Amino acid sequence: MNPNHPHISRVDGGFPDDFLDSLGHGTAVMAAIQEKAPDAEYFAVRVFDRELRTNIDALIAAIQWSIDRQMDIVNLSLGTSKHAEKFEPLVSRVIVVSAAGMFPGDLPGVIRVAPDPDIARDRYRVEGETFFASGYPRSMPGVSRERNLSGVSFAVANMTGFVARACENLTDRSYQSVFEKLRSE
């Protein structure tokens, strides 16, 4: 994550100490979240290095790092088709926002998100247990929407911003309370 990017208002900490994003993915994800919930605290936890690939141990360590520091929300703008059993003991201890159709997004107690190309970036909708949000990040001057990054990563990021905003006025920040608040808005 690049803390000097003009779309990033601040970063309150991170892991590892050098959490600089060489790909731009984490920066675009955080910018989308911060746009919707500018007053939340933000910590960058890097799981990608020089490519959009990681391993299950890095993901589990990142979630555990967040839990150990009593974070309220973990954005996982990624997913895997395996390892549900490794995510299960963690997702009940923090609000996780992740991609539908993958793990941990398809586990009970996770805010699962799918992209909707027709929804505005300042809106979301819910069908059953799945939230739908725009798959586009914040606009970049001089870059058309079609040439910018897009996809489920940014739908998850946009929804994470809505989750963070919903948590601002909740004393009970359990999955169920947050889910119900999001459904009612």
Label for each model-derived stretch:
Residues 22, 26, 152-155, 159, ...:
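Generic structural signal for well-ordered, non-membrane alpha-helical segments
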Residues 100-168:
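Extracellular S/T/G-rich loop segment that most often corresponds to the catalytic His/Ser-adjacent loop
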